[in-house]
């Protein structure tokens, strides 16, 4: 009975605005620690296979994937000196020594404009939905995290998708508000309102199952660790461990969709930025079949280790910071209640 009533009590003690503050702090910290890993990865990729002018590549700040346009052949929009790196550690050392430590966060500020609000919406919706589901059907409390996680991710992805598409368009050339409005109106007139959600399908196919698996496993691992260490509320270490484990499991299971989503995301981005192209983007399932034909079934699981290196720490940092923030506000609210008595 304790496990069913605890989330409801938590929802009473913590307001949605406090959940939003906790999630925004988690988002900022996650971006701060995870972005350097992806910047180094991009630099190593550019060294082995230079980006072609006008092509897209995917940049991750630990919260969201973002399409980025290579505006010239040497990639100097992203870094001042090309560099010749012998590996990941050498890349970190050389970038800091030759370009300054700030270069490890290249491209981060513009992506935070959408990543932080999307994360705030996602985490706040999850907690609110989970509490509502537990109250409305306490006998099925074990599936509340599964349903809430999938629904919250679906909402946040749907809300952010048009904004990400607009940001991608604006990378190709600066647009005034009038030009941007005309561009959007033209796309809608040609393909309907669904034109604003191009690329939404593969994003949802990856992120919704990932979110459902992540939250379900996170709650299970967290509950198990809390019972093992005889604590009602998760410590920072418990949240960190549960986040890393559940994030890794979800990343492995949904990897085929991540491979397809990345390829389709780049394809759709290039079509959107170069609207004169007559090429039509392939469907998600056609891309999946093409990958299997080209590289075998194993092609759908390409990049497993890099994905785990990125996802596990991002999930661990985000959820442990979020839980710490909620714990802080819970104690603060309890102290205020005691003072008012």
Swiss-Prot record:
Ranges for the Solcar repeats: 14-132, 140-224, 234-328
Subcellular location: Mitochondrion inner membrane
Keywords: Membrane, Mitochondrion, Mitochondrion inner membrane, Repeat, Transmembrane, Transmembrane helix, Transport
Segments crossing the lipid bilayer: 20-40, 104-124, 143-163, 200-221, 236-256, 299-319
Any GO BP: mitochondrial transmembrane transport
GO cellular component terms attached to this protein's record: mitochondrial inner membrane
InterPro entries linked to this entry: Mit_carrier, Mitochondrial_sb/sol_carrier, Mt_carrier_dom_sf, Mtm1-like
Gene3D superfamilies in the cross-refs: Mitochondrial carrier domain
Topological type in the membrane: Multi-pass membrane protein
Top-level taxonomic group: Eukaryota
Catalysed conversion reaction: glutathione(in) = glutathione(out)
Broad class of the protein's primary localization: mitochondrion
Protein role: Probable mitochondrial transporter required for glutathione import into mitochondria. Glutathione, which plays key roles in oxidative metabolism, is produced exclusively in the cytosol and is imported in many organelles. Mitochondrial glutathione is required for the activity and stability of proteins containing iron-sulfur clusters.
Family: Belongs to the mitochondrial carrier (TC 2.A.29) family.
Listed name of the protein: Mitochondrial glutathione transporter SLC25A40
